[in-house]
Amino acid sequence: MTFNIIELENWDRKEYFEHYFNQQTTYSITKEIDITLFKDMIKKKGYEIYPSLIYAIMEVVNKNKVFRTGINSENKLGYWDKLNPLYTVFNKQTEKFTNIWTESDKNFISFYNNYKNDLLEYKDKEEMFPKKPIPENTIPISMIPWIDFSSFNLNIGNNSSFLLPIITIGKFYSENNKIYIPVALQLHHSVCDGYHASLFMNEFQDIIHRVDDWI
């Protein structure tokens, strides 16, 4: 997958990038997403919620270059043409999780089938990362389906160059005849500001509302 180099000296975000990268400023934001219509449609069609949410997340991420901006293995700043999800799968027997990645696809059915194939092959492997090699252009997505939360923060203390988003989903709950799910977004301030966090959440809510258009 193509990694497009950003020439820092000519980048219009240079001052912001250097300031927040040197400070190592990361932040998280959590929003309750209305999945009332989404959950009903997913159930009617016979699909699982988790991969359907992953698909919607990746549609937002791959639509916006800012969420694909990072530093590659050669320590170069740039952005990927496309990112793939690296998601957690829980093993009830071992009470541990596995991280599996699946190729992103704009077609929901294609992505869903690829997800199911990867899940079948790797979900029972007692390894943290059973599907190898893991491509550089992946972002972490996880779900904590046992609890809903109003905030969530995940820090990477030994990798100061990890700039890509980290997304965590919680347990859905009902309130006032609506169904909500908490979504936490962890961002590096060197590449993403509050505007971009809002952009992600608003576009994610929009694609969830428009489930009829893509499922």
From Swiss-Prot:
Cystine pairs: none
Gene3D superfamilies hit by this protein: Chloramphenicol acetyltransferase-like domain (3.30.559.10)
Pfam family, one: CAT
Family: Belongs to the chloramphenicol acetyltransferase family.
Assembly notes: Homotrimer.
Catalytic reactions of this protein: chloramphenicol + acetyl-CoA = chloramphenicol 3-acetate + CoA
Function: This enzyme is an effector of chloramphenicol resistance in bacteria.
Protein name: Chloramphenicol acetyltransferase
One of the GO biological process terms: response to antibiotic
Keywords for the protein's UniProt record, in alphabetical order: Acyltransferase, Antibiotic resistance, Plasmid, Transferase
EC number(s) on file: 2.3.1.28
Annotated catalytic residues: 189 (proton acceptor)
GO molecular function: chloramphenicol O-acetyltransferase activity
Top-level taxon of the source organism: Bacteria
